[in-house]
Curated annotation (Swiss-Prot):
This is CEN-like protein 1. Keywords: Cytoplasm. May form complexes with phosphorylated ligands by interfering with kinases and their effectors. Belongs to the phosphatidylethanolamine-binding protein family. Gene3D superfamilies: PEBP-like (3.90.280.10). Expressed in vegetative axillary meristems but not in the main shoot meristem. GO terms for cellular component: cytoplasm. GO terms for biological process: flower development; vegetative to reproductive phase transition of meristem.
Length: 174
């Protein structure tokens, strides 16, 4: 199972540019608009991702706590992402086997608004060592997932998924 989950993340350079290689161990389901499930590499329209998704997580039991991070490594555009990364969302203290609504939103959801090219939006799940141990990020701009997770003692991700989005033009809306 692990290689099927990790391989698309390697191909899309999520592993390498955002996080180091890891072994997925927890189920992660991301659903926008009640029915649009996120699968690695699929494209979602900006209108679909305007409101925060429902994020369901597995895990052993409700005593385990998880942190969810959503970031865009392609800012301002994928060919020259000199502003990498832009932070879109952080939810902490999510009990295992529940969803993100049971956690603490320490950085509110910011709707993706890609301007130049096709952007990758990455959702990463980390197991916490305890509750209320993760601090809010200082800024959304120039966010660094590796540094942030190291500073907060989060270790390697236990799950990840990414999707693509690009600016909606009038022609694409038809």
């Amino acid at each position: 199972m692990a290689s099927r989950v990790v391989e698309p993340l390697v191909v899309a350079r999520v592993i390498g540019e955002v996080v180091d290689s890891f072994n997925p161990s927890v189920k992660l389901n991301v659903i926008y608009n009640g029915s649009k499930q996120v699968f690695n590499g699929h494209e979602l329209m900006p209108a679909v991702i305007a409101a925060k998704p429902r994020v369901e997580i597995g895990g052993e039991d409700m005593r385990s706590a998880y942190t969810l991070i959503m970031t865009d490594p392609d800012v301002p555009g994928p060919s020259d992402p000199y502003l990498r990364e832009h932070l879109h969302w952080i939810v902490t203290d999510i009990p295992g086997s529940t969803d993100s609504s049971f956690g603490r939103e320490i950085v509110s959801y910011e709707s993706p608004k890609p301007v130049i090219g096709i952007h990758r939006y990455v959702l990463l799940l980390y197991k916490q060592s305890g509750r209320q141990t993760v601090k809010p990020a200082a800024t959304r701009d120039h966010f660094n997932t590796r540094r942030y997770t190291a500073e907060n003692g989060l270790g390697s991700p236990v799950a990840a998924v990414y999707f693509n989005a690009q600016r909606e033009t009038a022609a694409r809306r038809r």
